[in-house]
């Protein structure tokens, strides 16, 4: 007696899990607390809590995760018996479109100092950025929207800005951009993704 028909019935995919849209990048001094869970998606709560919004970007924010590994091999097996992680690079990259001195400092390592001179007699007001190669650590967070329309937050407690920066001064080709590369310098166990899934019950 023949068996049951052989069927091909793949599981259903969830189209609403396919996400798109911008991520908002905030930076802060190391140790700055995140907003309360209730306010993770509220931009003003970040700013009032000591975080700085980097502003407009050229092509959004990118997350780059690159582990380096070492294969453990034995003669009796063609594939590795284990793959050991030797180091990990986690970077948040973007190109800043808003040319403020704070953003220039962030792109150039976040080690500079800003001083403000008030206007006075024969003295125009000015702000001076003095750069430094003593790069300073900072915290960063990327806030996006999840499939429920709530906030999803990548929190990296300690990063350093240490990437190459090339800014073109052109008459009309494009805006002046300041590329930023924020490299995680904290243990991976300190990095977290927070996903809001439901409103509070009261």
Cite the ranges covered by each PLM segment.
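Short helix-loop boundary/capping segments
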Residues: 101-157
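Beta-strand elements of well-folded, non-transmembrane domains
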Residues: 67, 96-100, 144-148, 160-162, ...
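Exposed beta-sheet edge/beta-hairpin loop segments within beta-rich domains
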Residues: 81-85, 129-133, 166-176
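Mixed-charge, glycine-accented linear interaction segment located at domain edges/termini
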Residues: 150-202
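Polar/acidic, low-complexity leader/linker segments enriched in S/T/G and N/D
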Residues: 1-54
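Oligomerization/assembly interface segments of phage tail-like spikes and tubes
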Residues: 82-102, 173-189
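A glycine-rich, hydrophobic loop/mini-helix early in the fold
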Residues: 44-88
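Ser/Thr- (and often Asn-) enriched beta-sheet segments in non-cytosolic proteins
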Residues: 52, 60-64, 89-93, 113-115, ...
